[in-house]
Amino acid sequence: MKRLRGTLPSDARHAWHPEPLGPAHRDGWDTRDDDRVWDVVVIGSGASGSVAADRLVRQGLDVLMIEEGFRLSPDLGNPELDDMCRTALARDGQGGWTDEGWPWTTSNLGGGTVFYGGASWRYRPFDFDPSELVDAGGLDVRWPYGLAELAPYYDVLERRLGVCGGEEGEGSRGPAHPPTAAAEVLYEAGTALGYEPFPTPLAINRHAHGGRSACERNSLCVSHQCSTGAKGDAVAVFLAPLAAHPNFTLRTGVRALRLNQDRPDAVGSVTCLDRLGRTTHRVRARSFVVACNAIQSAALLLRSRGGRAPDGVGNHSGLVGRGLTMKLSEYVSGVVDAPSAATLADWRAHAGPFSTIAFLDHYLDADCPTGVGGMIYESKNDMPSRIRDDVLELRIETILADHPNLDNRVRLSSHADEDGVPAVVIDYTPDPRDLRRLAYMTDVCERLLRKAGATGIAHEESGFAQGSCHLHGTCRAGDDPATSVVDGWGRVHSAPNVYVVDGGFMPYPGGLNPTLTIQAHALRSAKAVAGDLVSRHTAHV
């Protein structure tokens, strides 16, 4: 169980950035703030927490953000960071358990956005109400709102992030990045099969935008941090500007241990651990925004047991942690002869972006088991040097939504992590229907590659069942408190001054990369947080 205990901060100082992000930022807790009451505490600094904090600060609210990770040294890569992070218990697919479960995207300031490829999709109308085709065994898979409600928030975020590409005429996006040499081959093969390929939407500047430079295509932004600021990660777009704002406070290396529900209908404080000083502090606020990711947020709520929340905050229905979805995915690759020496040279000289072409032609597919297929897109190998000098690698990934299931859940272990906190258990077994769908979609991928003339077709598992970068469903949204954890605004039914704004709220995971949709939900929820605070203040005047 060694991996369940992550690296202590005292042993990882080489991984931190030597400078604070701005005047509002410091590592560890400041005891001068012990008696302060904040308007809002935001727990988590990744995709959703950064968006919510940005909106709340600009509404004039006094906001504290706590993040258990740290600001990373610019040279630190994703593999090195992963080696320092605690893991989780997870099913190993063979009837046993492994301590190599993965309960993060990454754990650091900015969260997984620091190492994601920038894929920024709008969900399809079907994703908001898949009930006609998706039977989740009694779980309601309908969202409390539809695409039209989220569209204005997508618009705002696409402009802020500098999203480029996507389907023609959709959204507020800039011009697409040039296709890679591999994408050009895939485009020809796809159109020959009758497909309608289009550029992958990416939160990466093609041209200078928002005070950030244009992409230089020098990495995939997955194993290494963006060196130019072109990628629209949470630090570059939201947190760095906020760090100079007078009503924003950022504390890294501070971990939320539990929420304290000291009134029948409200949480009054969060108990935190200063991971540097190893001291605990009770931090008070009027509202709390939980943005830790679908696994970590559920674990936090489950740890938050007390007299008014005996099973954990928000767990009035017994659903906190249940309905975990992580999407199924698989990579399929092959090689083709390079069209020319110049093409091959350009392909090797420019590693990024990781994806410049996508296909939604099988997103809904009557021939696929259940009628729900998935997405296919280019997913370049992060180590192309492994490929022979005279060929192009064509590597694609298929991603599809999994069926929510009450038995797939986040639980707490009897084992403790390095902070003495119960370790996370990822209790997840793929639905046989979804495995059949995945097999169908990988066959589709093979046909596409063979149409392109590829040889040496190979399959690569993603390991989704032990943890994923796409996490959803553990704090399900709905109108009925008996069958959901939060309402359509992310507001916890039994503690309405607590809001879950990460992917945990999703009653159905959708079949696309969820980051932009999670951010749009967080922006929408922040509007409710601000409005509720004003209403409560007015009621007491």
Curated annotation (Swiss-Prot):
This protein's UniProt keywords: Antibiotic biosynthesis, FAD, Flavoprotein, Oxidoreductase
Enzyme class: oxidoreductase
Name of this protein: Paromamine 6'-oxidase
Keyword Flavoprotein found: yes
Domain of life: Bacteria
Family according to the record: Belongs to the GMC oxidoreductase family.
Annotated GO MF terms: flavin adenine dinucleotide binding; oxidoreductase activity, acting on the CH-OH group of donors, oxygen as acceptor
Gene3D superfamilies named among the record's database cross-references: FAD/NAD(P)-binding domain
Region ranges (Disordered): 1-29
Organism per entry: Streptomyces fradiae
UniProt entry tagged with the keyword Protein transport: no
Family annotation (SUPFAM superfamilies): FAD-linked reductases, C-terminal domain (SSF54373), FAD/NAD(P)-binding domain (SSF51905)
Pathway named in the protein's UniProt entry: Antibiotic biosynthesis; neomycin biosynthesis
Lineage: Bacteria, Bacillati, Actinomycetota, Actinomycetes, Kitasatosporales
Pfam families: GMC_oxred_C, GMC_oxred_N, NAD_binding_8
Cofactor(s) needed by this chain: FAD
Function: Glucosaminyl-6'-oxidase involved in the biosynthetic pathway of neomycin by mediating FAD-dependent dehydrogenation of paromamine to 6'-dehydro-6'-oxoparomamine. Works in combination with neamine transaminase to replace the 6-hydroxy group of paromamine with an amino group. Also able to collaborate with neomycin C transaminase to replace the 6'''-hydroxy group of 6'''-hydroxyneomycin C with an amino group.
Catalysed reaction, written as an equation: 6'''-deamino-6'''-hydroxyneomycin C + O2 = 6'''-deamino-6'''-oxoneomycin C + H2O2; paromamine + O2 = 6'-oxoparomamine + H2O2
Catalytic residues, chain numbering: 470
One BP annotation, GO: neomycin biosynthetic process
Enzyme Commission code(s) on record: 1.1.3.43, 1.1.3.44
Disulfide-bonded cysteines: none
